């Protein structure tokens, strides 16, 4: 069940300032002990996550930033993992990041009882390097990341405790849509006004979802046609320098001990020479194609199509384009959608005797 609350814009505020005030009230009133939020760098050159426990440190907060800082879900893991202080955290995350957190909860990486997930409706984001331009140019004129242009889930969905709604909301408000008792309690504790969910909300969300589904379907078809026989796959990966940025920023790549840091993928000087002797010639860095194939197999059922992998790639490998051709197809085989529900087991974590593949 959804509960709606009105967070009114005050004194000439825009929605960004109103969302910042919401975080301020959450800390001031003790609704949570800490807030994880996107913070603008000095001069507005970029945006990164910050974890604040005092209201005076919220001045740089940009909860509705049109860019995705890296490591949001990973920071939430660190803030709630066993051994840390028992502090309740309100985390402002994009819808794709919320879906990643849902997957991490299933993998016992995040303690959900200590987190209130706040997720702004997302109209799409630009690359971090372009963030400064959002201050000087029309946001609609800036190119959105491909992952955002084909996003099928632009709202927080079931995984979010509270959506910071702009879709279907009045121009003078943020519509706080709570989906959990924890989210409802948060909205009440900050003094938001309870209202009915307006019919414009469902209509606006449905339009955004339909547009995303259509864009994703078109990209999926194009990607499958391009990569179906593998002919374009290896050339597309030819510029890989195996920096592992894609792996390091991936929100669902959670293993503490990783195959890619073993001798199989990260050979020592001696084993590198042995491989060169056996093969006669050896491309270095080694096993770049195998690296991507292994990563793809490892994360595909949990992938939320956030696009962080492509954004972090220094050589511009079209990873979102590649994943778009296989991500939904693999998940559909298991009747699964990553990040849809915390109660939905991941495909490879349970056994069904009567399992059928779609």
Per-region residue spans from a language model:
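Iron-sulfur-associated redox domains of electron-transfer enzymes in respiratory
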Residues: 1-233, 237
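A general structural signal for well-ordered secondary-structure junctions
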Residues: 32-33, 111, 246, 309, ...
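Local cysteine-cluster metal-coordination motifs and their immediate loop/turn environment
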Residues: 94-99, 143-155, 238-259, 300-316
């Amino acid at each position: 069940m959804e509960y709606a609350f009105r967070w009114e814009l005050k004194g000439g505020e825009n929605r960004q300032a109103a969302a910042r005030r919401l975080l301020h009230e959450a800390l001031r009133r003790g609704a949570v002990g800490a807030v994880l939020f996107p913070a603008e760098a000095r001069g507005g050159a970029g945006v990164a996550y910050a974890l604040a426990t005092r209201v005076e440190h919220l001045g740089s907060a940009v909860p509705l930033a049109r860019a995705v800082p890296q490591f949001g879900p990973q920071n939430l893991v660190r803030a709630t993992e066993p051994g840390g202080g028992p502090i309740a955290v309100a985390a402002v995350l994009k819808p794709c990041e919320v879906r990643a957190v849902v997957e991490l909860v299933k993998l016992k990486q995040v303690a959900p009882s200590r987190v209130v997930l706040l997720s702004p409706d997302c109209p799409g984001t630009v690359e971090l390097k372009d963030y400064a331009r959002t201050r000087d140019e029309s946001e609609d004129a800036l190119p959105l990341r491909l992952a955002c242009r084909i996003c099928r889930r632009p709202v927080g969905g079931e995984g979010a405790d509270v959506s910071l709604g702009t879709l279907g909301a009045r121009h003078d408000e943020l519509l706080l849509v709570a989906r959990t008792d924890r989210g409802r309690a948060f909205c009440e504790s900050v003094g938001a006004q309870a209202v009915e969910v307006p019919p414009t909300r469902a209509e606006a969300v449905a339009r955004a979802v339909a547009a995303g589904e259509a864009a994703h379907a078109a990209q999926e078809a194009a990607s499958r046609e391009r990569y179906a026989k593998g002919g374009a796959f290896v050339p597309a990966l030819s510029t890989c320098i195996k920096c592992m940025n894609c792996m390091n920023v991936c929100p669902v790549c959670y293993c503490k001990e990783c195959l890619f840091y073993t001798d199989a993928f990260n050979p020592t000087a001696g084993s590198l020479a042995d491989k060169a002797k056996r093969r006669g010639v050896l491309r270095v860095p080694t096993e770049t194609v195998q690296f991507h194939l292994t990563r793809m197999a490892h994360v595909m059922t949990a992938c939320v199509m956030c696009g962080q992998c492509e954004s972090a790639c220094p050589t511009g490998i079209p990873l979102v384009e590649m994943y778009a051709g296989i991500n939904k197809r693999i998940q559909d085989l298991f009747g699964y959608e990553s990040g849809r529900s915390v109660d939905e087991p991941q495909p490879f974590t349970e056994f069904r005797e009567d399992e059928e593949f779609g």
